[in-house]
Amino acid sequence: MANFSNDADLMKWEPTLFRDLAVPGQRLAAGVDGATSGITFTSASASFVDAGVAPGHVLRIEDSGGDAFGCYEVLSVESATELLATQVGRTAADSVDLPAGTGWVYFLDTFDPQAEEVRFELLSRLGLAVDDDGEDLQDLVLQPRTLRRASVFGTLLMVFEGQSGAAEEGRNLAAKAALYRRLYDKELAKLRVRLDRDADGFADDVRSPGSIRLQRG
């Protein structure tokens, strides 16, 4: 099942997240042979499909000297060696070209594991975590986008909380974690999620995630 938010959603709140706090163990792809033209990014050495790169992931590029040129939202994966990307929040219809060039150093990191934990947490709060067959009941959520902000805040909470102990700037990261804890709890308190139990496109039930705090495993 898809998470309720993606990496590009996180960047709308934390533009430097993938530059500052990328987790090496969660790196999908990287290389030194990136090339750009329009919104097309290619890497002859890549295997984007096998790496699991998907729309909503974030492409970070640098020049050979290590100077950052930005982070961009993946729009689509065209082949094993080619993807389309543009400024975060834009679509193919209103896309902005990538900086043109060759020999780009690039990284595709993800916080999908954290977003997946938050997805399960939100479903648990809604009583949808597991059915009799051992499957979750996310399909019952009529409008999954209503959970996007909660997913973003919960994911950022886990990212900052998880890295606050090890980093030199741990105090600042802990403060960020506390901020997203407040935003997460506030979002949960006002959320009302409509459920469609008979797949007719209409709500049969409305639930609130409640006020239980997100706990790290």
Describe the predicted segments one by one.
Residues A54-P55, T91-E116, F120, S124:
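Surface-exposed interaction regions enriched in Ser/Thr/Asp/Glu
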Residues M1-L28, L157-G217:
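Short loop/turn elements at secondary-structure junctions
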Residues G34, A51, S95, T110-P113, ...:
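Short linear motifs in intrinsically disordered/low-complexity regions
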Residues N3-D94:
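Autoprocessing Asn-cyclization modules and mimics
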Residues A30-G34, V105-Y106, I212:
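Generic structural motif
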Residues L108-L195:
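Internal mixed-charge
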Residues G31, S64, G127, R197, ...:
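Glycine-centered flexibility motif
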